[in-house]
Amino acid sequence: MDRIELTTPLSRDFRAVVRLIVGGIAETLDFAFDEVDDLQLAVERLLAEAGQDGSVNISFQLGSRSVRTHVGPLRERAIADALQGPPPEPGELNLRRILEAVVDSYGVEDAADGAIYVRLEKLREAR
């Protein structure tokens, strides 16, 4: 399994760069356009919720039909609460609902100093 590591500022100025990298990685695995877009949206939304201060590590593990993405450390506890708490109300659009729609699985891992890591997995459809 190949692995790619990236450290990026959380600043909004770098989100387009991250989107480009995520798209390139998914394209390498022959993901369909909508699958590429889904993975880009998941990472983008997660970074938007994380604020703009500091930096974050993003690692990508590339399988034959999947990308596992690990994002952190994130200091925004509201992310963990949104992903691990009760389901959103009908019609409420939050991070959890977005991730449930665009990735195949996600999870939250606790790290040192109260930070968290979020794990995302996107599978390529069989063709």
For the regions a language model picked out, list residue spans one by one.
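Helix-loop-beta hinge of the Bergerat
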Residues: 2-30
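Conserved beta-strand-loop-beta-strand hairpin that lines the nucleotide-binding pocket
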Residues: 1-4, 49-127
